[in-house]
Amino acid sequence: MVRIEAVYDGNLRCSATHIPSGQTLVTDAPVDNMGKGQSFSPTDLLATSMLNCMMTIIAIAADSRELDVSGMSGSVEKHMASGPRRVSKLSLIHI
């Protein structure tokens, strides 16, 4: 179990703390959704989580085969839809 605590800071911005490590991240609503766009949006983190999860799983598999994947990089595109506003597609560009 991992506990994460979040606080709404106002102005469509939230701070979330990963309790085991004490690390905090901030989300901000994007400009096209009434925010300032000064940080990752919650849906940006959804796309980031998918990409980072895939790269982590690849690294775990590589480590078990004694392969070095240091420097591996990837890219994902997030597509949004409206009515209701939602993520419509996550496109993995490359790993």
Where do the protein language model's features map onto the residues?
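Helix-adjacent hinge/juxtasegments
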Residues: A59-V76
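Conserved small/polar residues in nucleotide/adenosyl-binding loops
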Residues: I93-I95
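A short, glycine/Asx- and small/polar-enriched loop/turn
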Residues: G83-L90
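Glycine- and acidic-rich phosphate- and metal-coordinating loops
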Residues: G74, L90-S91
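Beta-strand elements of well-folded, non-transmembrane domains
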Residues: G10, K78-S82
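N-terminal presequence-like segments and the immediate start of the first folded domain
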Residues: M1-S41
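Compact, glycine-rich, soluble single-domain proteins
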Residues: P42-A61
